[in-house]
Amino acid sequence: IESTVDHGIKSMEEDPKRSMRRLCDLGRQFSKSRCQDYLFGIIQELLENEDSSYYDLVANALKNTDHGTIRDFGVAFGYTSWTYGARMLRSFEKRTGHAAPLTLMLRFQPDLAGGLSISDIDNIIQQGTAIGIFSYFIREVGGSSDSYEIINLFRKYPDCGFAYFRSSGRLTAAQIQ
């Protein structure tokens, strides 16, 4: 999977618009659920506009982001979460009769009494991955004094995809590495 994604990233650098449309077409062709088909259909509609800001977004990401990071993130979301994790979740739902989400959205509030701490988020991720949840959107609330802590937690789960929204400021180069 990784080598295929690496090839796709290289193709995107050469012709981002064509590559994005092609990847979306392939995604829709191989989608295995109504939800995946619907999602790829929406993306196809957005990409029909030659002036879509999504083309600029992807070109910017390719220019300014390590390609290994893009690959790892794409595999975590696109394969581990949406394919492998979705299969695990369907099995969990059949076995227990309880529905579970494909993605969890969490509020990281370490400085707030009763807010989610690193330990809380770690426990949630452990429980989530056990049933098939491999993608997490984490929003920092209240300005954490130490972003290194949460980033190290992300590194503990290399099969997961994380989108981290800080309350203010940017990550430092050291935090990104």
Annotate each language-model stretch with its function.
Residues 29-107, 130, 134:
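N-terminal [4Fe-4S]-dependent radical SAM core
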Residues 94, 123-131, 152-153:
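A generic secondary-structure signal
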Residues 103-119, 128-145, 157-177:
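Core AdoMet radical
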Residues 3, 11, 19, 31-33, ...:
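Generic serine detector
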Residues 6, 15, 25, 37, ...:
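Acidic-enriched, low-complexity/disordered segments with a strong bias for Aspartate over Glutamate
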Residues 2, 13-14, 45-48, 93, ...:
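Glutamate identity and glutamate-enriched acidic tracts
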Residues 75-82, 86, 117-124, 146-151, ...:
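Well-ordered, non-membrane alpha-helical segments in soluble/globular domains
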Residues 1-50:
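Long terminal accessory regions outside catalytic cores
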